[in-house]
């Protein structure tokens, strides 16, 4: 049954990513794809919160960890799209822009995950 919930949550995460990415990229015209950056950082924060809540047993059911963490966050965030968009930014805007985009996303994602773990531990 858990696998079914992971699949359903993953589908919801993918739809949420599509809608949010479309909305962000239609509103902001920047040289790098802002939508994927925002989504991956948000997903890192959310996964940190989920992980901390599950590890600390803060009223968070272990049955929700896989569907929300692996399913929703896995469907919501996207490493492959980020990789392609970074390569396109490097090709279209220069290697420096591509490298900054890549490093910025990685650093922001890790910091967001740390923040999520910290916040989730205090709830």
From Swiss-Prot:
Activity regulation, short description: Na(+) is not transported, but it plays an essential structural role and its presence is essential for fluoride channel function.
One of the GO BP terms on file: cellular detoxification of fluoride
Locations listed in the record: Cell membrane
Coiled-coil regions, chain positions: none
Keywords (A to Z) from UniProt: Cell membrane, Ion channel, Ion transport, Membrane, Metal-binding, Sodium, Transmembrane, Transmembrane helix, Transport
Catalytic activity: fluoride(in) = fluoride(out)
Keyword Calcium: no
Binding site for Na(+): 74, 77
Major localization class: membrane
Metal-binding recorded as keyword: yes
GO MF terms held by the record: fluoride channel activity; metal ion binding
TM region positions: 1-21, 30-50, 99-119
InterPro entries to which the protein is assigned, alphabetical: FluC
Gene Ontology CC terms, in alphabetical order: plasma membrane
Superkingdom of source: Bacteria
Lipid bilayer topology: Multi-pass membrane protein
Function recorded in the entry: Fluoride-specific ion channel. Important for reducing fluoride concentration in the cell, thus reducing its toxicity.
UniProt-listed HAMAP family: FluC
Entry's family note: Belongs to the fluoride channel Fluc/FEX (TC 1.A.43) family.
Protein name per Swiss-Prot or TrEMBL: Fluoride-specific ion channel FluC 2
Organism (species): Cutibacterium acnes (strain DSM 16379 / KPA171202) (Propionibacterium acnes)
């Amino acid at each position: 049954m858990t696998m079914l919930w992971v699949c359903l949550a993953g589908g919801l995460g993918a739809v949420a990513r599509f809608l949010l990415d479309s909305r962000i990229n239609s509103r902001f015209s920047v040289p790098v794809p802002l939508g994927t950056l925002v989504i991956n950082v948000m997903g890192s924060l959310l996964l940190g919160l989920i992980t901390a809540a599950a590890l600390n047993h803060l009223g968070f059911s272990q049955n929700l960890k896989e569907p929300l963490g692996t399913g929703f966050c896995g469907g919501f965030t996207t490493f492959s799209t980020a990789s392609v968009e970074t390569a396109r930014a490097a090709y279209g805007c220069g290697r420096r822009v591509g490298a900054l985009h890549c490093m910025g996303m990685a650093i922001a994602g890790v910091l967001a995950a740390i923040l999520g773990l910290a916040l989730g531990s205090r709830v």
